[in-house]
Amino acid sequence: MNISRKEQRVLHVLAQGGRIRHWRDARRIVAVDCIDRDGNRLVDCDLATFDRLRRRGLIASYGGAPYVASEAGRRAVRAQPDNR
């Protein structure tokens, strides 16, 4: 699967324990914020990147919780030296 650099960065953060918080306006998601496990904000995560990852099934939200990497997302992310 072809994944852009922005998508790889977001998936890498999520694979290490990060979360994507989302805000809704009635029914639609209008804003997202990607937070790594240390509490730092990832600037590369915008609404378009979020939509692409969600459409491909690489991220998922369980029970209204923040979005995390799904099993498919963890398999799709490329290995990097600092992965845990």
Which sequence ranges carry the predicted segments?
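Short amphipathic alpha-helical interface segments
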Residues: 2-47
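Short, amphipathic alpha-helical interaction segments positioned at domain boundaries
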Residues: 72-84
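A general structural signal for well-ordered secondary-structure junctions
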Residues: 19-20, 59, 83
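A short, conserved structural fragment
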Residues: 54-64
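Minor-groove-contacting beta-hairpin "wing" of winged helix-turn-helix DNA-binding domains
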Residues: 65-70
